[in-house]
């Protein structure tokens, strides 16, 4: 069975939407996804970059992210056809490990906890396919690299790209 590595933030979970929501609650300004296109993390919001970064240290930031559309049904099908592992960087922010684990067990209850890998760097993982939104995670991966579209990666075109979970299903479940 082929091994599939899947990222969590901005792939399964809508981390960008969470930043937008937290920013609006904190500063009273709604930032559109479109305004974030082609911008790295520190440029996506007009002001208060340190405060935006600090959202990730707040209780509930990772636990309350929305699930990306169609990810659950496609992941359920992929789990029947691949050896699936959710691999997420979870060491930088104190609450992220526990919150990510709770989020995954709630929203992807058909996956076993042994399929969750929390790490500091993804260079340690190997597999046949990797789906991630961050190009630097894909660059060192040994298998087929699949870039999941997010506002911060639109300028990259040297990986196979998917624009959502329906496209993931079309690519990997044919």
How should each PLM-predicted stretch be described?
Residues 83-85, 129, 146:
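A structural signal for isolated positions on well-ordered beta-strands in alpha/beta enzyme cores
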Residues 87-140:
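Substrate-recognition "cap/lid" segment bordering the active-site pocket of phosphatases
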Residues 1-51:
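Active-site neighborhood of HAD-like aspartate-dependent phosphohydrolases
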Residues 57-87, 93-98:
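Short, acidic loop-to-helix structural element flanking the phosphoryl-transfer center
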């Amino acid at each position: 069975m082929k091994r599939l590595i899947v990222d969590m933030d901005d792939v399964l979970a809508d981390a960008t939407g969470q930043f937008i929501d937290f920013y609006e609650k904190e500063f009273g300004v709604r930032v559109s996804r479109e305004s974030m296109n082609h911008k790295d993390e520190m440029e996506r919001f007009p002001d208060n970059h340190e405060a935006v970064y600090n959202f990730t240290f707040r209780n509930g930031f990772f636990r309350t992210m929305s699930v990306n559309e169609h990810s659950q049904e496609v992941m359920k099908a992929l789990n029947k056809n691949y050896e699936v592992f959710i691999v997420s960087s979870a060491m930088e922010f104190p609450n992220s490990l526990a919150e990510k684990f709770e989020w995954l067990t709630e929203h992807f209850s058909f996956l076993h906890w042994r399929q969750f890998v929390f790490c500091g760097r993804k260079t340690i993982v190997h597999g046949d396919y990797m789906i991630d939104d961050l190009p630097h995670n894909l660059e060192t991966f040994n298998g087929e690299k699949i870039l999941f579209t997010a506002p911060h990666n639109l300028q990259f075109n040297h990986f196979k790209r998917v624009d959502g979970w329906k496209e993931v299903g079309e690519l990997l479940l044919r």
